[in-house]
């Protein structure tokens, strides 16, 4: 028997049928659990329903906590004087003046950076991923919102690193160490070096940084659907911005 050609306006033929509900974006707790347990499945869900703001808000909260705990204990003189003394164009009097100024402003400016830099970093990296996706996606190019998810959610695997920094700053003298040098999670913690660029390279080889880069590669493949070469390029850009420039400009 043929179907009734006189379908009612409520029929799907007229667009009035029941439509499937839009996919629901994974919540923040689901994202945190997912990056440690089922990252591929998480990124596939985020492709259908991107989410990024809760992750960045959490990064800001953690960055503020790290800055407060570290900034109240750090010895600014011990942190800056060796670097300034290596610069022959800076006199002893100028060194003292710079250190005195930094002691006053390191905490307020650090807190401002903790609030704004996570947003700026995610927006910038997402734009670069979006550009890569325009030319190196396997099918449809990713949206900017999907790129924002890829730029933020994989970094949730680094949350324990921030908590370790806070714990180490509370339990031991900080001296002139910067936050990333406090927890025993990098090669630089176990292999001391004198050359500033080598020091930066060794501390860049951190367990949580490596995990973030690996998860980001998965996000590029499963969330943005980039070709393998595109995922490699996007991962290279991430490593360049997170580690390469630090090594290049280390003094």
PLM region spans:
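Short juxtamembrane and helix-loop transition motifs at transmembrane-helix boundaries
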Residues: 21-23, 110, 193-199
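Residue-level detector of alpha-helix boundaries and kinks
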Residues: 24-25, 117, 205
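Hydrophobic alpha-helical transmembrane segments and adjacent short intramembrane/lumenal linkers
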Residues: 141, 145-251
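Selected alpha-helical membrane-embedding segments in polytopic membrane proteins
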Residues: 28, 36-160
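Short, flexible segments with low predicted structural confidence
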Residues: 17, 103-104, 191-192
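Low-complexity, intrinsically disordered extramembrane tails and loops of integral membrane proteins
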Residues: 1-26
């Amino acid at each position: 028997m043929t179907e009734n050609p006189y379908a009612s306006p409520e029929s799907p033929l007229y667009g009035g049928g029941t439509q499937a509900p839009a996919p629901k974006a994974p919540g923040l707790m689901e994202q945190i659990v997912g990056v440690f347990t089922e990252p591929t499945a998480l990124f596939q869900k985020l492709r259908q329903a991107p989410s990024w703001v809760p992750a960045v808000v959490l990064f800001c909260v953690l960055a503020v906590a790290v800055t407060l705990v570290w900034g109240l204990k750090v010895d600014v003189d011990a942190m800056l004087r060796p670097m300034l003394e290596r610069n022959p164009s800076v006199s002893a009097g100028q060194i003292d003046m710079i250190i005195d100024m930094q002691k006053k402003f390191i905490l307020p400016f650090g807190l401002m950076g903790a609030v704004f830099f996570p947003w700026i970093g995610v927006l910038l990296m997402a734009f670069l991923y979006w550009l890569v996706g325009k030319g190196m996606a396997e099918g449809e190019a990713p949206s900017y919102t999907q790129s924002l998810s890829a730029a933020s959610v994989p970094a949730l695997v680094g949350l324990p690193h921030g908590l370790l920094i806070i714990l180490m700053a509370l339990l031991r003298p900080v001296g002139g160490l910067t936050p990333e040098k406090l927890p025993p999670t990098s090669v630089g913690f176990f292999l001391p070096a004198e050359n500033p660029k080598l020091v930066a390279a060794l501390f860049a080889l951190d367990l949580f940084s490596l995990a973030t880069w690996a998860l980001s590669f998965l996000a590029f493949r499963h969330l943005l659907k980039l070709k393998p070469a595109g995922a490699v390029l996007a991962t290279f850009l991430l490593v360049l911005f997170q580690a390469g420039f630090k090594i290049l400009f280390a003094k």
